[in-house]
């Protein structure tokens, strides 16, 4: 199930001034693993896409993983454009917030972070702070995982309902 339609529908409901053209909008993959999702959404919207390459230190292992030393952006100029970052999962959210910061540093306008699975394993404090600092506009995740009342109460959060699509799998 591709949640792209639900993400776009909910973004447009909350951003009536968004222009769906290549001069005003880009879709971003936060890493090479998410390219398929970003290409799918960008092609359906008829806009450009970009991606971040996670450069890792393969000589070190921390918590069972090679640490990321830099996010390298591959794509067109983002200045003044709205960004839709699409990924499969927000676990701690560190990568998503880092990508949003790098896009803001490049003078992106509004940033919408979309993820099928919003786990927020490190809590919401980092997202609260980033939102207060203007780092992003909205976070959208689907309801295929539990959403805490705390998350649902956030001004910046939008829940995208996939229940009717999940039900179709069982009928």
What is the meaning of each model-derived region?
Residues 1-169:
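PRPP-associated nucleotide enzymes
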């Amino acid at each position: 199930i591709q949640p792209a339609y639900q993400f776009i529908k909910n973004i447009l409901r909350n951003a009536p001034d968004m222009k769906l053209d290549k001069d005003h909008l880009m879709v971003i993959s936060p890493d090479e693993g998410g390219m398929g999702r970003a290409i799918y959404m960008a092609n359906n919207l008829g806009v450009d896409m970009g991606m971040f390459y996670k450069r890792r230190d393969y000589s070190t292992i921390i918590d069972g993983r090679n640490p990321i030393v830099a996010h390298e952006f591959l794509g067109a100029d983002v200045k003044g454009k709205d960004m839709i970052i699409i990924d499969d999962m927000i676990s701690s959210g560190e990568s998503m917030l880092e990508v949003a910061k790098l896009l803001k540093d490049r003078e992106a306008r509004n940033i919408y972070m979309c993820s099928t699975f919003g786990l927020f394993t490190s809590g919401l404090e980092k997202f609260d702070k980033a939102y207060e600092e203007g780092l992003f506009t909205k976070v959208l995740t689907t309801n295929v995982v539990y959403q805490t009342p705390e998350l649902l109460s956030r001004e910046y959060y939008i829940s995208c309902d996939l229940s009717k699509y999940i039900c179709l799998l069982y009928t």
